[in-house]
Amino acid sequence: MTNQRYVRTVQKQIPLIPNKNIIGEPEKKNTAMAMGVAAAWIYKRDPKAIIINLATDHLIQKPAAYRKTLKAAAKIAYEQDKLVAVGIVPTFPHTGLGYIHIGKKISEDGSMPAHEMKGFTEKPNLANAKKFIKT
């Protein structure tokens, strides 16, 4: 799923993905709506599919570790039939990002622990972002 105007660019940049699998957003309605449309589209074609939704505005400094994390997340999703959110531990309060509130540990693959998600706060105000950093 991408913005309609980027479909051709994505097709050129990722030639291994069949063009029919690159979807242009029918209408710009932000991330959650795009994720829902993409999930419905994929589910219609394969109800057992494991879906990984990735933002495109981040820098991946350790590609091998990133791939390992995504594989571990997909494994948990498949084996435990769980919805998985991958996050990083923030180093400073940021009001433009969402915060995952973690619960009990459900598994650990080497250095990658997996926790239940107690909640999620999307783009908190600065006071709350500062609280989240401390916890």
Regions found by a protein language model. Give the residues of each.
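Conserved N-terminal catalytic core of the sugar/cofactor nucleotidyltransferase
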Residues: M1-N53, Q61, K71
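Cofactor-binding loop segments of dinucleotide-utilizing enzymes, especially the Rossmann-like FAD-
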Residues: N3, T56, I88
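Proline-rich low-complexity regions
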Residues: P15, P26, A55, P90-H94, ...
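Residue-level signal for inorganic ion chemistry
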Residues: A38, D57, I100
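Conserved core of the sugar-phosphate nucleotidyltransferase
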Residues: P63-T135
